[in-house]
Swiss-Prot record:
GO terms for biological process: carbohydrate metabolic process; glucosamine catabolic process; N-acetylglucosamine catabolic process; N-acetylneuraminate catabolic process. This is Glucosamine-6-phosphate deaminase. Keywords: Carbohydrate metabolism, Hydrolase. InterPro entries: Glc/Gal-6P_isomerase, Glucosamine6P_isomerase, Glucosamine6P_isomerase_CS, NagB/RpiA_transferase-like. It is an enzyme of class 3 (hydrolase). SUPFAM superfamilies: NagB/RpiA/CoA transferase-like. Catalyzes the reversible isomerization-deamination of glucosamine 6-phosphate (GlcN6P) to form fructose 6-phosphate (Fru6P) and ammonium ion. GO terms for cellular component: cytoplasm. The lineage of its organism: Bacteria, Bacillati, Bacillota, Bacilli, Bacillales. GO terms for molecular function: glucosamine-6-phosphate deaminase activity; identical protein binding.
Length: 241
C-alpha cells in the first residue's frame, strides 16, 4: 500500500481526480468503480471542473458503483443513484447507458447480485476502484466478519453504519436496514484501488490499517492482498501515524 498525505481534503480531492483523469487519458474506455458518502465529494467536484474546462471527457468511460440501499427506488432522494447524479453524472458527458449501480428496488435481490457481478465481468472488469473507509474498517458495505471471498451480496447494515448515514435522512428510522454491496473479492479484482480518507474521525482507522494484520474482522485489511493500492489521506486523517 502506498500512502500519500496532503495538507487538507481539498488537495486530496484534486490529486484523486488527477489520478482518475490519468486513468481515462491512458484508457478512454476505462471502467471506474465509484463510491458515495462525504469523502469523494471534493474528488467529484474536481472531475466536474476538469470536464467543464475541457481537460477531460467521459464519453467512452463506464462506471459501476460499490453499493446501493435495498428498498429504495433509483429516483428516491436518498438513493445512491440520486447521489451520483447530483454530485457527478448530471454535470459531465458520461452517457446514461454507461453508468451502473445495483438496483436496490429489485424484487429479487439475490438475482440482482448475480446480475451485477456478471455486468462487471461483461464490461471488462474495473480498471480503478475508488473507496472510502468506515471507522470500523468497512469498505463498501462490507462490515467486519465479511468473508474475503465474497462477491456482490445483500448485507444487513450495522447499526453504527446506519447512525453514520442518518444525517442524510430525516430520521434514523428512514435509513434502510439492508443494502446491496460489491464484495471484498469484487473489490480486490479491480486492477487498481484508490482509497480516500480525510478528517480526524478517520485517524484511528488509518493508524490501525497500517499496523494491523490481515483479518476479516477488519475488512480494509484485505487491501494488503492487492498489488496496486494507493491511499490518499489529509493531515488530520494521518495525525496518529
Amino acid at each position: 500500500m502506498n500512502i500519500i498525505e496532503f495538507e487538507d481534503k481539498e488537495q486530496l480531492g484534486k490529486e484523486a481526480a488527477a489520478l482518475i483523469a490519468r486513468t481515462i487519458a491512458s484508457k478512454p474506455d476505462a471502467v471506474l468503480g465509484l463510491a458515495t458518502g462525504g469523502t469523494p465529494l471534493d474528488t467529484y467536484q474536481e472531475l466536474i471542473h476538469l470536464y467543464q474546462s475541457q481537460q477531460l471527457s467521459f464519453k467512452q468511460t463506464k462506471t459501476v458503483n460499490l453499493d446501493e440501499y435495498a428498498g429504495l427506488d433509483p429516483d428516491h432522494e436518498n438513493s445512491y443513484m440520486t447521489y451520483m447524479k447530483r454530485h457527478l453524472f448530471d454535470h459531465i458527458d458520461l452517457p446514461q447507458d454507461q453508468y451502473f449501480l445495483p438496483n436496490g428496488a429489485s424484487p429479487d435481490l439475490e438475482k440482482e447480485c448475480l446480475r451485477y457481478d456478471q455486468l462487471i465481468q461483461d464490461i471488462g472488469g474495473i480498471d480503478l476502484q475508488l473507496l472510502g473507509i468506515g471507522q470500523n474498517g468497512h469498505i463498501g458495505f462490507n462490515e467486519p466478519g465479511t468473508p474475503f471471498n465474497s462477491m456482490t451480496h445483500v448485507v444487513q447494515l450495522d447499526e453504527n453504519t446506519r447512525q453514520a448515514n442518518a444525517r442524510y435522512f430525516s430520521s434514523i428510522d428512514e435509513v434502510p436496514t439492508h443494502a446491496i454491496t460489491m464484495g471484498i473479492a469484487s473489490i480486490l479484482s479491480s486492477k487498481k484501488i484508490l482509497l480516500l480518507a480525510s478528517g480526524k474521525s478517520k485517524a484511528k482507522v488509518i493508524q490501525y490499517l497500517e499496523q494491523t494484520e490481515i483479518h476479516p474482522d477488519f475488512p480494509a485489511s484485505a487491501l494488503k492482498l492487492h498489488e496496486d493500492v494507493t491511499i490518499l489521506i489529509d493531515r488530520e486523517a494521518g495525525s496518529l501515524r
